[in-house]
Structure formats: C-alpha cells, structure tokens
C-alpha cells in the first residue's frame, strides 16, 4: 500500500508540473528533412559573344570530365526553371551532333534546359531541315555559336566505311548522301591501322559537316562574316568525356573550299 501511495503521489506531482508549464521532452519527427548540403546553382548568365559561348561550353565540359557538374545535378530550382522556360527560350549555342544515345550534350557540357539548341542526326550530318533549324536558332533565338560535334566509335561513320560505296539497305541511302565524299577525301594510308583510320574519319566528318552548313546557308555565312557567329567543329571522346574543339570555320576557309 505504501508503495502504491508513493507511486500515485509522484504521478500527481508530474501532472501538476506539466499543467504549470514544465517543458516536456519530445522526439523530433521521424520525417523531418535534413538540411540541404548545398544550395542550388544560380542561373548562369548567357554568354554575349561567340568566344564567350565557346568558353562556357569548354568550362562545362571540363566540369563534366572532372566529375564536378554543377548545373545538371541540383533539382531545387527545377520548378522555377520550368516556369521561366514556359515563357520562351534564348539558347546561346546550337549543338549539331549524332543521334547516338551515348552523346548527351546537355550533360557533357553541363548546361541546364533552355541553354542549348540541339539538332541530332545520325553521323552528325544535318540535312536541309537541320540547317534550317540552325538558322532559326541563330536568327530568331539569338544563338551565337554552332558546334558541329562528332564522336568516337561512331556507328554511322563505321557503316559508311564498311559499305565502301555500296548502297546501304532501306532509307540508309540518305545517310550515305549526307556523308558523300568522306572516304574519297580521306583515304586510308597504306600503313594506317583500322582504329587510327576510323579516328581520322570521325574528325574529318565533323570538319566536313561544319563546312557543309556554311556552304549551304547564306544566312549563316553572313553572320560568320560579320563575326556575330562562330561555327566550330568538335569531337567528343566517349571514353574520356572530353570534347576537342577545332578552329572555327571562316568565310575564307569556305571560299578556299570551293
């Protein structure tokens, strides 16, 4: 009985203390969110010149190679980004590249949605519609740079090489048409192994396609001539992740091409 009375008395004191504002211990909710490890990357300013646009892509690719992407990792500002892009776009660069699933230009240049205008064709060989798309981005969206980017281990280049002028089946003739002359202008050296020759063909194709869009577009020639636009061939290495940029195509080069 004495023990029961003592227990009841202790319980009564605890209730009285709680009524008079004694703080009660409580556990933090199990679902409480942990503090963010870092804030979302601020929106990047758009480059205001062709050289600045190329520098931005080069810096983004360096982050990708180093495993330090900043603009394609954070998701905290996705909603705001979608809201802003719903009102329009202003991509600072056009990337014409291959349809290969391993070539993800936004990731390898570490750029958010709305910053790159992407045109994809097998063999990075744009047809007239692809060139028109590039003109649209330059004329109406303000793009200041076109990167014509090939890549290593390109299946389209391999197919052209193995066909060696013989017709490919189905509609693949269009692929041969878009890359016509590649083997003739880039013959294999007698002592050159297959791997080295493929690497040379992939680079040559990127350069030829960059020249091709300049040849076929008066609008792009005018912009390049007035230094408002650069057209830059490039090659993406699938293994290293690095993009090698080559010298911009110029009107002088275009005239020499003829």
Regions found by a protein language model. Give the residues of each.
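Divalent-metal-activated hydrolytic enzyme cores
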Residues: 19-88, 114, 123-132, 136-141, ...
């Amino acid at each position: 009985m004495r023990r029961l009375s003592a227990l009841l008395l202790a319980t009564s004191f605890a209730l009285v203390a709680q009524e008079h504002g004694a703080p009660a211990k409580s556990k933090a909710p199990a679902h409480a969110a942990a503090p963010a490890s870092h804030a979302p990357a601020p929106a990047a300013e758009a480059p205001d010149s062709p050289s600045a646009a190329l520098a931005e892509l080069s810096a983004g690719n360096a982050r990708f190679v180093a495993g330090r992407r900043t603009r394609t990792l954070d998701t905290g500002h996705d909603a705001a980004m979608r809201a802003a892009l719903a009102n329009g776009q202003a991509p600072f660069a056009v990337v014409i590249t291959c349809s290969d699933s391993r070539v993800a230009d936004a990731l390898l240049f570490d750029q958010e949605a709305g910053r790159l205008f992407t045109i994809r064709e097998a063999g990075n060989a744009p047809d007239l519609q692809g060139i028109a798309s590039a003109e649209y981005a330059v004329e109406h969206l303000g793009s200041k740079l076109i990167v014509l980017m090939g890549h290593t281990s390109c299946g389209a280049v391999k197919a052209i090489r193995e066909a060696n002028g013989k017709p490919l089946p189905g509609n693949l003739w269009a692929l041969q048409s878009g890359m016509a002359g590649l083997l003739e202008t880039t013959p294999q050296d007698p002592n050159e192994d297959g791997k080295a020759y493929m690497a040379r063909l992939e680079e040559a194709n990127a350069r030829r396609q960059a020249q091709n869009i300049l040849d076929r577009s008066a609008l792009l020639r005018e912009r390049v001539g007035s230094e408002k636009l650069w057209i830059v061939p490039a090659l993406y290495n699938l293994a290293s992740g690095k993009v090698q940029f080559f010298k911009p195509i110029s009107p002088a080069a275009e005239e020499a091409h003829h």
